[in-house]
């Protein structure tokens, strides 16, 4: 019985696993999320991302596609709305010079209905900007 409880507990913990260790031969891109928003890794170079929490890419040029979900406050909507309107958007970020062993950070936000994304290097220098690739209401 104890073995069964221990095994069940370990299986539950495995589902809550943290991020893997970065591969030093790849570039690692962290996704920075904010309260009440969601940012997910979708694609790298038209291939589905294996993990929605980060990107890991070989050195060189790549196009990253992310999904960004965010609320638009009623004050930005106008009219009788009292609840936020949720937007579900995709953004594309291209960068030509990912380097092995380097960590990057992709940050997203919005101004009213318009989403934005920026890619930062380790020195917090902006090295890429996101381009909207479509939005819808949720």
In which residue ranges do the predicted regions lie?
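Short loop/turn and low-complexity linker motifs enriched in small/turn-promoting residues
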Residues: 16-138
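Sec-dependent bacterial lipoprotein signal peptides
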Residues: 1-17
